[in-house]
Amino acid sequence: MSELAVGKKAPSFTGINTQGVKRKLSELVGEKGLVLYFYPKDNTPGCTTEACDFRDNYENLKKLGFNVVGVSRDDEKSHKKFTEKQNLNFELISDVSGEICEKYGVWQEKVFMGKKSMGIVRTTFLIDSSLKILKIYPKVSVKGHVMQIMKDIEELSK
């Protein structure tokens, strides 16, 4: 994997969405860009809070020209249940193999309650319409994250 950095091209990928349809990165980008966020697991407290925050601000992000897509290693059946339960209005991409997570460098060793394990480190990438990375948000804290993204999009648009 090449080093991901602001100004570099976002790694291309093809993933399966909630409806079982193959979607390419290039098909997911909005008029001005994409908010691509990686999260550990469907229907867990932090991931639900984050997804609902994106859901509640989706129209505002669309007005700014950005689409939202979430990626985790859950399968499409899990994503479908999560989408229905939380009434999500954006696509989730299933990365069961972990290939997309590896390309974006978010599959890492984590420590929880003293135990080490591999997992997705909550990370968001702001990508422009030409698929260049505008901003990387590593080790995301859920609270206030979506508001920060919208603020950053507005700043970058000036």
What does each model-identified segment do?
Residues M1-K158:
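Chalcogenol-based redox active-site neighborhoods
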